Amino acid sequence: LTPVFGLEDVGGYGRDVALYLIEQGYFVKFVNSSLSNSERNSYAMTQKNDSWDAQCVANVLIRQLPHLPDTSPSDIHWVIGQLVGRRNAIIKAQTALKNQLHIQLNYHYPSYKDFFSEVDGKTALAFWESYPSPSHLKGVTMEGLRTFLLEASNNACSTRKAEKILLFVQADGEVKREYQTSRDFIIQSMVRNISYTKQEIKKMDTELKVTIQKLGMQLETMPGIDTVTASALIAEIGDIHRFTNSDKLARYSGVAPIKMGSGGKETMKKTKQGNRKLYDVFYNLAVQQVQVSKGSKIPRNPVFYAYYNQKQSEGKSKSQALLCIMRRLVRIVYGMMKNKTAYILLRMPETKAS
């Protein structure tokens, strides 16, 4: 007899267990938690404890052994997933810091939103750190502020920007309060933190680019796919060879509709099942494919834009047409990942969007 192990978790804490068992020569099957949960709820009296969970996993393993996927942990896909997760965590922290900075700046500079186009831009951060409150601008001439802004912005900001800021500060009036030094320190601390996270994101993007290149894929040759998007696709899909065709990848990502019916009547319905993170990646990618340049009105990807309009002319709504784009993208991405081919943008007669 050859023992077979079934594990619910093969990507998190259970990954090391799966690797150890495989190295010892055992067969390890991945049991989706939804299957064991369905097994648990199939009994009249439900319970939840470790031993019963193990029994439910074993029951699923016995009944569905031929249909359960083998566990084959891939180090590079796992590492890419960890890098993507870390990057997302930094982005989330940066967003929280930016929101906190908005709150603090509102106390010090009521008109701060009119100072710079981006509150966390390079020049803006330099200004907030040097002048966290209007009291630091006392005695600063327009020429002095202009010189500071020119240096911080690499000669992008002019005298007009310095004049504009000083006029807004004057119009806002006195905003100095008790413990102003501590309040200023809070803003300066946030600025340093935001600057640090920006540097970390750049380093993370560089590391991701180097790592995904080891797979030999050319996903970034497709319009709309940069290093971040390519990394997200690889992290969520994993080893592409575990999907025998693009239809299975479409079902896994929740892009493919499911069959619903009763009493001999059946229809295809959009589903919210599948990997929703992967679904979001394909959705955002589909939106980019049908984008149109604001100035020239030329579509970013003429082929997909024409296909998008074709589906709408057939009676589909915009969301339905976008879903058709997503399904086609799944097929293309599947082929590019499996065969490690580049995307070839077909040339079409340039037509401006209406």
Language-model segments: which ranges?
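A detector of single, family-specific signature residues
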Residues: 1-354
